[in-house]
Amino acid sequence: MAPPPFRPENAIKRADELISVGEKQAALQSLHDFITARRIRWATPSTVEPVVFKFLEIGVELKKGKLLKDGLHQYKKLIQGSTEGLVSVGAVARKFIDLVESKIASEQTRADELQKQEIDDDLEGGVTPENLLISVYESDQSVAGFNDEAITSWLRFTWESYRAVLDLLRNNALLEITYSGVVKKTMHFCLKYQRKNEFKRLAEMLRQHLDAANYQQSKSGNNLVDLSDADTLQRYLDQRFQQVDVSVKLELWHEAYRSIEDVFHLMKISKRAPKPSTLANYYENLVKVFFVSGDPLLHTTAWKKFYKLYSTNPRATEEEFKTYSSTIFLSAISTQLDEIPSIGYDPHLRMYRLLNLDAKPTRKEMLQSIIEDESIYGKVDEELKELYDIIEVNFDVDTVKQQLENLLVKLSSKTYFSQYIAPLRDVIMRRVFVAASQKFTTVSQSELYKLATLPAPLDLSAWDIEKSLLQAAVEDYVSITIDHESAKVTFAKDPFDIFASTASKEVSEEENTEPEVQEEKEETDEALGPQETEDGEEKEEESDPVIIRNSYIHNKLLELSNVLHDVDSFNNASYMEKVRIARETLIKKNKDDLEKISKIVDERVKRSQEQKQKHMEHAALHAEQDAEVRQQRILEEKAAIEAKLEEEAHRRLIEKKKREFEAIKEREITKMITEVNAKGHVYIDPNEAKSLDLDTIKQVIIAEVSKNKSELESRMEYAMKKLDHTERALRKVELPLLQKEVDKLQETDTANYEAMKKKIVDAAKAEYEARMADRKNLVMVYDDYLKFKEHVSGTKESELAAIRNQKKAELEAAKKARIEEVRKRRYEEAIARRKEEIANAERQKRAQELAEATRKQREIEEAAAKKSTPYSFRAGNREPPSTPSTLPKATVSPDKAKLDMIAQKQREMEEAIEQRLAGRTAGGSSPATPATPATPATPTPSSGPKKMTMAEKLRAKRLAKGGR
């Protein structure tokens, strides 16, 4: 049996019918069943799309995210075998996103309107205790400004829809463009509604999709994403650029940094350079990220790259160039001092690679590169150039405050200056402290803080100035000693002096405490005695390596100090210069030591590999002998292990049996005690019963039960006697009281009965009197009522009679019209039947006449044929002589004349029939008068026989053949 025809419009019609009766859920389920059926695999996707669109519309309206996701995935699974199917999947995904976005927009508009109305209604605003109590039991949860659950649920549904569509479209070459569009819309959604957590999940999801696409490059399959394609890679790169932009706008700095790494890796493998405008926007976002991260060098580098790209913008103005150039130069000036080299791993080194920098640039190099670049330095504000001269070129700690006082007033009016106030203040403060350490050896705190107090907006409190001073000391730009009693600050001139004195004290203390520690260790070892291992051997005493770190550092610094003090440039330098020289020397020395260690390690590895090679060669030569020895040792060890395991298993079995017996015994005792205690006759303490066996417990129970039974019997006998006397006394006392109560109840019932009876009688009397009053009133107006009734009846009767006569006349007229209509219709039908009968009769007569004419013509032709053939040859057996092809003229002409005559008669008969029919039709209005037949026209003798037309000749020939 063939399957029913595939009609998607029926599914839509069925869904509309269910929606019309309020069954939207059933309509959604019916559409889901239709689009997930296997039969649509062989259908044209364009015919199924309207059903899917209807399914999406209802699903979005009902917020059935899981059902929608399942339906879309099943639909893709069924039709993804063809290109048209994947195109349909893309169209369906776009429709789904459009529906969701329009719905969330309408819900947001409605929520804004409701909120506006609530604000207008409730002038007090906010959340009150009354509103909180009302919100507990109100279904709409619409307390003014308190609960936004409706819009939140739609936001959650929108986010889940975006996720479902991205999962539907991912890693398919034919759906890349749609996938890219949905990604951009999802990021716009997160930005518009400030969905930070959702944006983090989106970024992680996109990374997983890219990882999956990268993994599939080595696989084979249909419609796989080709990352070697320039357009595909550019789309992924544009997504990451937008991801960085949205991360910065949402202030998700960690996510922005991860997105920057994604962009860096994609740009490395991309063969096509991004657009300058896109790169400029990207570097502008990097500027913000690196400013927040606290790395001014990266911040300035990103500014320079942005400016280089922005300078190619034809729409850029000179004012913008001036602002950006000044900002770049100010950011470079605000970079922290890095004159002392850092020791150890720089955590920001990885970030420099993101800007294609081979090494970390110094502050001095950055400033020098900006000054040498005329396209930047030539457009810098003069105030910043003056600031650079004050801080970097001609810095004087005594005059810096006066120089900055007028300059900062001008700079404060600049829009770009406010964000660099804090880093610029740190740079100037660091310069002030370094200059003060060179100028003073000991200075009062008030004088130093006065010297470090800068004009507004760079001013700080005394506490913040002290924090900056301590930070400078931590970073080794100065070395200070603060005496709070005398309020003095002492600056060290040599970094080795303070540390050497401190280290010597610590070393002496450690030397004094070392013997005591050694004695305590020896006493502890004697008390514990020699320790043994599991095999019974005495463990050799291992000496713990004790490294006195302070002493080690002290010795190393002494060596470094001896080396550096022999250098004239070190002795004549300031504290900061000495620290810089010492660190550079240490870095160089450590680098040399590391190179030596690396060489030693390489040599050791080489020797180890050579020894390993020799050992392998030796093992190969003695492999057979070693194998026998090893096999014998393995067998012995295996036998010993098996014996030990067997013994251990036997011991464990015995212990297991004992434990099981004890457990059963304990369980039985516990069960017995529980049952006895549950009955309540005897109570046995479970803790005390642990030391008793089962028989002893039974004897205790029997003794306790016997004792309790005798006590119970005696108490019962006493209680029965007491109860008998008490019951008798109670009955004697309560008998008069019960009689009084019965009498009282009878009196009360009698009084209630009389009151009820009186109430009923009074009500009946009142009702009777009221009805009698009504009757009296009605009797008074009864005559008037009858007169009015007769008057109204007479008036209405005449009106009704007139209406009846009118309706009767109308009915008669309608009947006559109907009769005339029926008669006319029947007359016309009779005329039509009569015409049909006449036409049939004429056709029959005409057919008979034609048959008669045909017969006569056939007879004439036969007679003519007989005359043309000689008699002798017809009767004989010989063949007739050959006849010439053309007969003589005298022989042919009679036959032709006969044929012309027959045709003439036939024409006359046809004309007569037509005239008769025409006459009857014209006289149809008077059927009683018969139509006069038309007299056929007699041909004129002089005119001769009329020639036959070609059609008449052919018709005559057909009739002749039919007659034969």
Swiss-Prot record:
One of its GO terms (cellular component) is eukaryotic translation initiation factor 3 complex, eIF3e. Residues 503-545, 839-964 are annotated as: Disordered. InterPro entries: EIF3A, eIF3a_PCI_TPR-like, PCI_dom. The modification Phosphothreonine is found at T935. GO terms for biological process: formation of cytoplasmic translation initiation complex; translation reinitiation; translational initiation. Residues 508-544 have a biased composition (Acidic residues). Residues 625-668, 702-734, 796-869 form a coiled coil. Keywords: Coiled coil, Cytoplasm, Initiation factor, Phosphoprotein, Protein biosynthesis, RNA-binding. Residues 923-945 have a biased composition (Low complexity). Disulfide bonds: none annotated. Belongs to the eIF-3 subunit A family. This is Eukaryotic translation initiation factor 3 subunit A.
